[in-house]
């Protein structure tokens, strides 16, 4: 029997305890806050672990890390990035291409905390209506950004990039960034469920393409154990990725292979029947 969205995870907490039902959420928040702290430790305490912001940085003043989308924009705009930027982009692309689908979105992006809060409040308030927006729109926006940069010769996305703006806001003050975050929060809360991350964000679209063949995947252990409580669907920011592995035909894979999965592990947390686990794309046991 399907549970109400506002009670998602309750059965898991009652059966296995709070830690089991929230462990991946806890580790994700710790990861996001730790990375943010590494950026802020320099400006606030003079300890430069990550120098820069989410668009581009230096780890320990040695290892370059560059946002692949910004790098692609630069190339499209015919502004050849320096060697350090290209190396940094290559490191990021290789890391996420191997590690897991959209791991940046679920484990690094600070904006994920804002959109997750909107999704949680939406469930608690029982808001069910949502605007019908194609999930493919984000890929269209990604293409338009690159085309726009090519035509204009400018890095158009950096004018409005809320992820980079949020990182800078903790140092320079929120100002207009605070209003931008409020708009995204209210959009997700009142207009479209998972509207920003699930339908519009071109950064997530870029990481989806990068991690399309990545190693780490969510796997359904045993479809027969599913009791159709719908808790996993209610908490998943990309619920469509669960349909085939969980309720697909017998010959369909038990792995969540969609590039839209953000590898957050919330489906594992909230499932009282322990239907899901983290595995690799090469795990075909049970099929």
UniProtKB/Swiss-Prot annotation:
GO molecular function, one term: 4 iron, 4 sulfur cluster binding
Disulfide pattern: none
Periplasmic side: 51-79, 161-170
Sequence ranges assigned to domain 4Fe-4S ferredoxin-type in this UniProt record: 217-247, 252-281
Record's cofactor remark: Binds 2 [4Fe-4S] cluster.
Keywords noted in UniProt: 4Fe-4S, Cell inner membrane, Cell membrane, Electron transport, Iron, Iron-sulfur, Membrane, Metal-binding, Repeat, Transmembrane, Transmembrane helix, Transport
Cofactor (UniProt): [4Fe-4S] cluster
A Gene Ontology term for the protein's cellular component: plasma membrane
Location within or outside the cell: Cell inner membrane
Binding site for [4Fe-4S] cluster 2: 261, 264, 267, 271
Membrane topology summary: Multi-pass membrane protein
PROSITE patterns for this protein: 4FE4S_FER_1, 4FE4S_FER_2
Residues noted as binding [4Fe-4S] cluster 1 in the record, renumbered to the chain: 226, 229, 232, 236
Signal peptide: none
Segments traversing the membrane: 30-50, 80-100, 140-160, 171-191
Positions on the Cytoplasmic side per record topology: 1-29, 101-139, 192-287
Described function: Required for electron transfer from ubiquinol, via NapC, to the periplasmic nitrate reductase NapAB complex.
Subunit structure: Interacts with NapC.
Protein's name according to its UniProt entry: Ferredoxin-type protein NapH
């Amino acid at each position: 029997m399907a549970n109400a969205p506002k009670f998602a995870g309750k059965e898991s907490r009652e059966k296995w305890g709070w830690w089991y039902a929230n462990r991946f959420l806890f580790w994700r928040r710790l990861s996001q806050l730790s990375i943010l702290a590494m950026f802020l430790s320099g400006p606030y305490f003079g300890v430069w672990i990550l120098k820069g912001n989410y668009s581009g940085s230096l780890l320990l003043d040695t290892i370059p890390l560059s946002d692949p989308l910004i790098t692609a924009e630069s190339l499209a705009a015919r502004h050849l990035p320096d060697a350090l930027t290209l190396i940094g982009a290559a490191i990021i692309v290789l890391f996420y291409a191997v590690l897991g689908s959209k791991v940046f979105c679920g484990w690094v992006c600070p904006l994920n905390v804002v959109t997750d809060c909107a999704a949680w409040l939406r469930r608690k308030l029982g808001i069910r209506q949502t605007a019908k927006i194609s999930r493919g729109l984000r890929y269209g926006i990604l293409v338009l950004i690159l085309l726009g940069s090519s035509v204009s010769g400018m890095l158009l996305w950096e004018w409005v990039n809320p992820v980079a703006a949020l990182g800078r806001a903790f140092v320079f003050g929120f100002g207009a960034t605070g209003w931008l975050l409020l708009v995204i929060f209210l959009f997700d809360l009142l207009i479209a469920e998972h509207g920003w991350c699930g339908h519009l964000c071109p950064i997530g679209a870029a990481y989806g393409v990068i991690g399309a063949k990545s190693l780490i995947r969510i796997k359904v252990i045993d479809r027969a154990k599913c009791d159709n409580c719908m808790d996993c669907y209610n908490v998943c920011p990309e619920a469509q990725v669960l349909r085939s592995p969980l309720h697909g035909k017998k010959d369909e894979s038990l792995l969540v292979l969609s590039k839209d999965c953000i590898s957050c592990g919330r489906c594992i947390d909230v499932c009282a029947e322990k239907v899901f686990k983290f595995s690799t794309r090469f795990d075909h046991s049970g099929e």
